[in-house]
Amino acid sequence: MKIVAIGIGQCGCNIADQFYAINDYSKSFFGRRIEILTDAFAVNTDDTDLSSLKYIPRDMSHRIVIGATRTSGHGVGKVNYEGATIMKESLPVIIDDVLNSRNFYACDAVMVIASGAGGTGSGGIGPLVSALRERVGKPVYAIVVLPFGYEELRETSYAVVNTATCLKTVNQVADAVFVLDNERFGRGSVSLARNLEVVNQQMVRNFFDLFCAGEEGRQKFVGSTVVDAGDIKQSLESISTIGRGEATLPIFHRWKKNHYKESSNGAISLVGALSQAINNLCLNVGAEDARTILALLCAPQDIINLNAVTEISNHLQQRAPKAEIRIADYPRRAREISITLVLSTLTSVGRTENIYLKATELLNKRKALIEEVDSSIKRVEELCAGIPILV
């Protein structure tokens, strides 16, 4: 599956930059010689954030500054309404750049990425996704990044209200929304910059095998059950999440694969990778909450046998008896085993439900706070009513 990646705001642009980086690796001689990205764009109201990107081309068709006359290139200050207004004004320019990009006709979907907590990304992603769905004639998916826990603690937290507004809007206009929770991958002892870098890399890495599997051209790496853009499209709807789990075979597995002790190791390793994939989901949900599940098994051909696939299928059926389950394989060499797991049409997401509840409470508190501030200002004005001014 080939995509066009569009990042909005600082967070979204950084993730789009990582998609560009992993595509460069994928195309290389030392990678898989597969192209999974036709192009990538970074859209922001802050030109300084755009200058920090490493991989997306530096021309103005790929790094797009919007709202320069309103913000002077310094962002919208977390005001998502301002971000939405600027995005609506800039839609013709952005969409023309996307449609005129190299090999756009070859892409299977468009992925729009933003943080829910910011201003430009949170406000801009809804209008852009809606406009793209009307124009491009391809599935338009969204990635929305949830804020860190510390951003939600303040009684006047813009992060909570912005995220709730963003999620509600995007869920109504996108074909599917991947929700990434920063809290799932954050490490307290590591710098904030490193935390953000790890989260971005992990998110993009989760999609790597999934996108490569349907574009593989070498016969020995083509699976018996191939997952392509059509399968992904049918598997995705509404709120979704993705995770990846890994296991490693013994060094001498290739020479011992006929040994009786090795007969069950493959299935055991795959089940272990599946458990890790569930634990590594970008959102804290269980498989039982999904109505659609897609599992991609990546391993040497001798490991992906009928017994192993049956074991994985039974394991998923037990965890999610009501879900429609698709299982595909992607033969790889070397000793690495991995499983990419996509859960979609999630019926219960505690994290987002809590954000909606907090946002409602904060909006009510904000109204009372505004009234209190207005009352205080009026009282001060009354106190100084008899004092002259020198203007």
Q: Each predicted region: which residue ranges?
A:
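Tubulin/FtsZ superfamily GTPase core signature
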Residues: 1-391
